[in-house]
Amino acid sequence: MRNIVFHDKTKTFHLYNEKISYIMCVLENGHMGQIYFGKKIHDKEDFSYLVEKIERPMTSYIYEWDKSFSLEHIRQEYPVYGTTDYRHPAIELLQKNGSRISEFKYTGYEITKGKPKLQGLPAIYAESEEEAVTLRIYLRDSLTGIILELLY
């Protein structure tokens, strides 16, 4: 993506080029959620109307007072094992104590010029820093201290 915008008030990221938009945000529980991927749309500060929040019977809720917020039905950017989302996780870590439960929450981001090389992984490349912009999103599990770094 050539353009990356972060809206601090809504904690929303909008990545876009001439044809497509990719929008994600920090959810109310600190996880990253995917809001939109498709035809380019105009940037705005608040895309929360695109997050589907409705009550569903027989599902797991994060908050007792909010039966419209369920990780089982929200598109997460990087879902993990054991957080009431029963779909396949993006990562499952076996910890020393035998637990596989992680909860990676947003801690920050960084936008830099260029495209870093990923050792041992297939990736596109950029000839110069002006050809690309990279977004790094940092997620941290508070119990283990492990930090995930997502690159876009």
What are these regions (language model features)?
Residues M1-Y152:
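N-terminal accessory beta-strand-rich subdomains and adjacent acidic, glycine-rich linkers
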